[in-house]
């Protein structure tokens, strides 16, 4: 069960990395870094919370 949820988290993370990199294309480097950090926080934190919730079930 845990392994399955980790697999799905990994695949979701790779999809989100692709989305983040496509969002960041075309903006300046300084804005890039801020946007990437914001996007990473928005993506990773709910992902971790979901993973924790799934692991508890």
Swiss-Prot record:
Regions crossing the membrane: 34-54
Q: Which GO terms describe its cellular component?
A: membrane
Q: Which domain of life is it from?
A: Eukaryota
Report membrane topology.
Single-pass membrane protein
The answer, when asked if Membrane is one of the entry's keywords, is: yes
Keywords assigned: Membrane, Transmembrane, Transmembrane helix
In which compartments does the protein localize?
Answer: Membrane
Q: State what protein this is by name.
A: Uncharacterized protein DDB_G0283507
């Amino acid at each position: 069960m845990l392994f399955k949820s980790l697999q799905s988290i990994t695949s979701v993370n790779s999809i989100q990395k692709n989305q983040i990199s496509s969002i960041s294309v075309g903006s300046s480097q300084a804005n890039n870094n801020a946007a990437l950090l914001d996007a990473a926080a928005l993506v990773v934190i709910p992902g971790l919370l979901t993973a924790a919730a799934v692991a508890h079930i």
